[in-house]
Amino acid sequence: MKNSALVVIDLQNDITKHYREIIENVNAAIDWAVEKELWVIYIQHNNLSAGTRTFKPGTRGAELVPELKVVSDHMFTKAKSSALTNESFAAFLQEHGITHCYLAGADAAACIKSTCFNMRKSGYAVHVLSDCITSYDKKKLPEMLAYYASKGCSVTTLQEFVEGIGIGR
């Protein structure tokens, strides 16, 4: 399934503490992706705005959370919400013929949302792993899952992912 990638977004020390509730599932998704030879890609947010304190490059807050399994060196940084704003990431997807992306990480109401929208707009098949995402405001998760579906993304659980339901070929 070389045309598919698991994209892990913004699981960094400055992200919401709610990541602890999904980290086991995210790591299980990473294990499965490795076993099935999907690309595993990590996206990190860098906050370049003056006066902000979170996600500052070179700080502990900008580092990936220590519990996250890192199995590849396919790491890209972004300064805006959508992962596709990183031209190297977009080029990587193109160069490797990746057409299906499975998203995990945070924040469901910000960077995951923006990445989903922009990837769909760019013609990618986007699959959100519903039990591998979180948000600062967890009450927004049902609304975000409905939003993703309304934009043409499939919303699937980790179990459905592992069983191959909805996996891009």
Task: Give the predicted meaning of each segment.
Residues M1-A5, A28-K36, R53-R169:
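Active-site-adjacent betaalpha module
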Residues V8-I9:
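Short hydrophobic beta-strand that contains or immediately precedes a catalytic carboxylate
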Residues Q12, N46-N47, D107, I133:
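Catalytic metal-binding/acid-base residues of hydrolase active sites
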Residues Q12-H18:
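Short acidic, Gly/Ser-rich segments with clustered Asp/Glu that frequently serve as metal-coordination loops
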Residues K17, A50-G51:
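Glycine/Thr-rich phosphate-binding loops of Rossmann-like dinucleotide-binding domains
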Residues Y19-N27:
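Short amphipathic alpha-helical segment that frequently serves as the phosphate-/nucleotide-binding helix
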Residues A33-S49:
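Von Willebrand factor
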